[in-house]
Amino acid sequence: MSVQPRTAIVLLNFNGKEYLQQNLPFIKNTDYENKKIYVIDNHSSDDSVMYLHSEHPDIIIIRNEKNLGYAAGYNMGLSQIDAEYFILLNTDVEVTENFIRPVITLMETDKNIGICQPKILSLSKRNYFEYAGGAGGWIDIAGYTFARGRIFDSYEEDIGQFNDNSQIFWASGACMFIRASLFRILRGFYEDFYMYYEEVDLCWRAYAAGYTVISCGDAEVYHKETDQLLHQSPQRLYYLFRNNLIMLHRNLPLSSSLFILPARLLLNLVSILYFISNGYMKIASKSAKAQIDYLGWAWSKKNMDIVNKKSLTNSKSVFKGLVIFQYYILGKKKFSDIVKF
């Protein structure tokens, strides 16, 4: 690249002073020069903003008047930023010095690439992939998501097996590169999600708009693992169950949704019965509420106009089977055991 495109590194913060202290020095030390760093603050109650003013006066702060969550928080902040590329970065991500340049170079050489992510590795087990996105996300025919290097709670060691630039279905919101023009065309994240699945929905719509989503094997970052208690919390599972159904409803053509959505509701019911039989009553209750709230959402949005729907059967990065069957019944724990090229 003779002239580096204007790139905005944008962190969404809520009471994350500790992570800002840890990770901003790494971000500032990246070898990409034409960048500006922004922090969108979701009405933090700690002294994050005071810390930024004191220790990082060069960082641009955008303050939201309340905690808007991931989707609306980013939408509000990014609407105020002028750049050619947005890098959406979690505050708990440690970046490497050269994580930007390979991705931007790749996207500049192919204008059809709308969204990209680096490899996302574990911060504590640095040679293993991490839950948030591994080496790029896939989806199966029923809408279950998984990633190269991470199938449910099984993580692969990074031995170079995903060092290629590969088409994926979704890029992780923990570290996502997106053309600013595309983000505006897509009107940003869908705010009804609040959190979880907003990046999968965004990437699905990018495909429907004629763009591709790529994992760049020449770049990597390190993500702090979610606390195990939070990972299994009833509220988190509520959003995962509900938002997956909303995502499918929004993006599937009618011909596909008439089969897939009832099948998913039935499979979710099986999960709820499993939770009950094992005494996980709070998780079962929240999961059941997710199904009910999805149906309420679907009824309230029955006349909404969703354009450019795209079938799951038409993408190279869709597994044409059930990943839950491969994983739980056949015992396949690695991406290469499930997806054959």
Task: Enumerate the language-model features and the residues they cover.
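Short aromatic/hydrophobic "clamp" motif used to bind/position activated sugar donors
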Residues: 86
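Acidic helix N-cap motif at the loop->helix transition within catalytic regions
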Residues: 21, 46-54
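Active-site-adjacent helix/loop segment of glycosyltransferases
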Residues: 10, 213-323, 327-328
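A short, conserved alpha-helix in the catalytic core of glycosyltransferases
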Residues: 162-220
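Glycine-rich, basic loop-to-helix element that forms the pyrophosphate-binding segment
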Residues: 63-81, 91-93, 102
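Conserved donor NDP-sugar-binding/catalytic core segment of glycosyltransferases
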Residues: 94-133, 137-144
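Short, acidic, metal-binding catalytic loop of nucleotide-sugar glycosyltransferases
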Residues: 25-34
